[in-house]
From Swiss-Prot:
Transmembrane portions of the chain: none
Lineage: Archaea, Methanobacteriati, Methanobacteriota, Thermococci, Thermococcales
Family: Belongs to the universal ribosomal protein uS14 family. Zinc-binding uS14 subfamily.
UniProt-recorded name of the protein: Small ribosomal subunit protein uS14
Naturally occurring in which organism (per UniProt): Pyrococcus abyssi (strain GE5 / Orsay)
Binding residue positions for Zn(2+): 21, 24, 39, 42
Length: 56
């Protein structure tokens, strides 16, 4: 096998690397509820615009 063959990877089907944030592209903590697909950092920024409210 050539070295170039090692760089070709099949797309991930499950796990953290399978989903990206649609806003910033981060792979880590994704919020998928209601089909949001946002990382938690982006979700905290846009949550008020989406209609989410913080209750005490």
């Amino acid at each position: 096998m050539a070295k170039a063959d090692y760089n070709k990877r099949k797309p991930r089907k499950f796990g953290k690397g399978a989903r990206r944030c649609i806003r910033c592209g981060q792979y880590g903590p994704i919020i998928r509820i209601h089909g949001l697909m946002l990382c938690r950092h982006c979700f905290r920024e846009v949550a008020p615009k989406l209609g989410f409210r913080k209750y005490e």
